[in-house]
Amino acid sequence: MFLKASCSLLTLVLLGTAIAFADQPKAARSVASRLTTEELARWIDERFAEAWQESKIVSPEVVDDATFMRRTFLDLTGSIPSVSEARDFLEYSSEQRRGALVDRLLNDPRRPEKYAERTAAHWATLWRRMMVPGNSPEAQMAVGLDPWLKEQFTANVPYDELVRKLVTAKNDGQALAVVNPRLGVRNGGPTLFFQAVGGKPETAASSVSRVFLGVRIGCAECHDHPFAAWKQKDFWGMAAFFAGVKNGGIDDSSAAKIRPENGLIDYTAVFLGGEEAKIANGKTSRETLADWMVSENNPLFAATVVNRVWQHLIGRGMTDSVDDLDKASPAERRILDDLAKKFVEAGFDLRWLIAGICKSQLYQRECLVLNDTVTEPPPGLRPIKTLSPEQVFDSLEKALSLPVARADGSARFNGLRDQLISRMNEAASNNPEEFRAGIPQALLLMNGRLTTEATDLDQSRTLRGVLDAPFLDTEAKLLTLYLATFSRPPRAEEKQFLLEHIRKQVDGDKQQQAYAEIFWGLLNSPEFVLEK
């Protein structure tokens, strides 16, 4: 049973401001044929129930409330819940509390700065890392895209409009705005995308095709693709749309012809699939490409974004590789293509898609543990995921009650955030189901500052607040440390063992040190950096 804390200044500082959960009113349909998010969730469950029955797959059990809460906070906001957020949800008795949590995190009109903006910032980071992956100087430059992407996600700009803005971005002649003076990161808006991917027609064509159409044509730059249907003429036909992208800058001319360096042939702009582009008067070649890309009839565009969102939320895409959609079999794409059609009918509404997936029973089922006999989950079954570098640090902020770092470089802990993320990026994988030992090792490397201070009785905000709270007994203190780190109560065996350990300490100082050791162990446990 959860202890109800009395109202005090310490309680508010330690546990944060509470969430007031309530049944959420259903939003009016903005598109006549779109499903509600609850209807979409049921549709997803029905389709996968049929697929699993055909494959004789036994559905995993639905997870408990604590696991769902932690999973949803991590997937939508990029960090674990605070202690107060965890208590509020776990003590909320409505049968609709899971759906209410999803709606609250995606769009709380009463307090957008608390949830919707956090969610938008997290998805901006996800999208930027997807568009410009890795830890190269170019990828670091792309951090300047985050403020612009956050604006798009905060406003819930339809995805087709967002991509159109990126593909048709124009130089506005204004100076770049500084985002992080210490790192020299600048905000160039959507034009920065082309600079970050190399600033040349061929790099732009390769990146746009992979990111937004789910196909990799880069291997066809110099020769026909050895494992796919793409020919060299397909690659340069796409590159011709970006003939005005040179040396990191953008020329808004309607140029639609290109000759490779040291080449003998001019290539004109051709859509993937072989149809020659006709550039209308008054339009640039990139505007013509954007019209084709975001068309409701394009079989790759909507399916690619649905597959990417699915990979983030479930842990793996509906196809083997989200960047090789063209290689997927019709059987693999059956549910994906049908879901993509519904996404189009919903007006390319990303918030609608995310909510529908998170409200489904499929999203709420237990992870499948991989072993020697099960090397990869069947479609729709989620693996255990590792947290991204940003998720690890932002979760540490929550667990340790640190001042929240900000992208403008003004917060005390931004240097530590950058250092931790940089180290973890060296060990992290773009595939969220791949766990690497480098992540807990990176945490250990940071013990000199973060986790050591966090478990120091004189410096730790969370630990000091728990130990000094007069209204928390031994059991409640242990519970609070678990909520702060694992977002769940201790299991019966954990509780029994740790309470016995605490109560064995003969004096107050040793008992306080026992709490510090427990907190250190929780922070450095693999469970802290895994999403189950």
Give the label of every model feature segment.
Residues 1-5:
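Positively charged n-region of N-terminal signal peptides that target proteins for export
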Residues 6-17:
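Bacterial N-terminal signal peptides
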Residues 20-22:
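Boundary at the C-terminal end of the N-terminal hydrophobic targeting segment
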Residues 27-269, 301-340, 350, 354-467, ...:
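Short, structured secondary-structure elements
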Residues 266-278:
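Internal "kinase-insert"/substrate-recognition segments embedded within catalytic cores
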Residues 279-284, 288-301, 305-313:
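Structured secondary-structure scaffolds
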Residues 345-346:
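Localized edge beta-strand/strand-to-loop motifs within extracellular or lumenal beta-rich domains
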Residues 487:
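Conserved micro-motifs of the catalytic ATP-binding
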